[in-house]
Swiss-Prot record:
GO terms for biological process: ribosomal small subunit biogenesis; translation. It is found in: Plastid, Chloroplast. One of the primary rRNA binding proteins, it binds directly to 16S rRNA where it nucleates assembly of the body of the 30S subunit. With S5 and S12 plays an important role in translational accuracy. Coiled coil: none annotated. GO terms for molecular function: rRNA binding; structural constituent of ribosome. Its main location: plastid. The keyword Oxidoreductase does not apply. This is Small ribosomal subunit protein uS4c. It comes from Woodwardia unigemmata.
Length: 185
């Protein structure tokens, strides 16, 4: 059997591994931190930019404010309380008007919860059915929230205080995110 026109498929060229020898730029490090934060909370670029701009205007550490604001979003609070298995599922519960904050219907997932807010599920059969298939998300409830998921009654959550750095268990350097957006000002 000769070599003919068909190429020998057993041979292939080994590509040189340039990624190991190439130095990662500071821009790349900042972009990765920003993307990790963005995808973890399911935000668009514009939403995250809005939170960074709010953080710049506040007093205190600019890097710590965006994670605090993101942790206090209604969709994230519902996820952390265990009422939804994922943040997108929590967003859907809010959008479909299944959630009450202080006994008022809130259908905006980006609603910023405040301390002493009481989050409950509407007293409708469809609202209760929406939660039946959900399993507790994230394991333990953070210390800035209190959950009561007792059988027979509606699931209820209470926001005790504003989230702090310890309750946000992300391995992200928030200052890198702020530095990334310092170019966009």
């Amino acid at each position: 059997m000769g070599r003919g026109k068909t190429p020998n498929l057993g041979e292939f060229r080994v590509a040189t591994d340039q990624s190991a020898s190439r130095k990662i730029s500071q821009f790349c490090v900042r972009l990765e931190a920003k993307q990790r934060l963005r995808f973890n909370y399911g935000l668009t670029e514009r939403q995250l930019l809005k939170y960074v701009r709010i953080a710049r205007k506040t007093r205190g550490s600019t890097g710590q404010v965006p994670p605090q604001l993101l942790e206090m979003r209604l969709d994230n609070v519902i996820f952390r309380l265990g009422m939804a298995s994922t943040i997108p599922a929590a967003r859907q519960l809010v959008n479909h008007r299944h959630i009450l904050v202080n006994n008022r219907i809130v259908d905006v997932p980006s609603y910023r919860c405040k301390p002493k807010d009481i989050i409950t599920v509407r007293n409708r059969p469809t609202s209760c059915n929406a939660l039946k298939g959900e399993s507790p998300g994230g394991g333990e409830t953070p210390d800035h929230l209190t959950a009561s998921l007792s059988e027979g009654s509606r699931p209820t959550g209470l926001v005790n205080r504003i989230a702090n750095r310890e309750s946000v268990n992300l391995n992200i350097n928030e200052l890198l995110v702020v530095e990334y957006y310092s170019r966009k000002a």
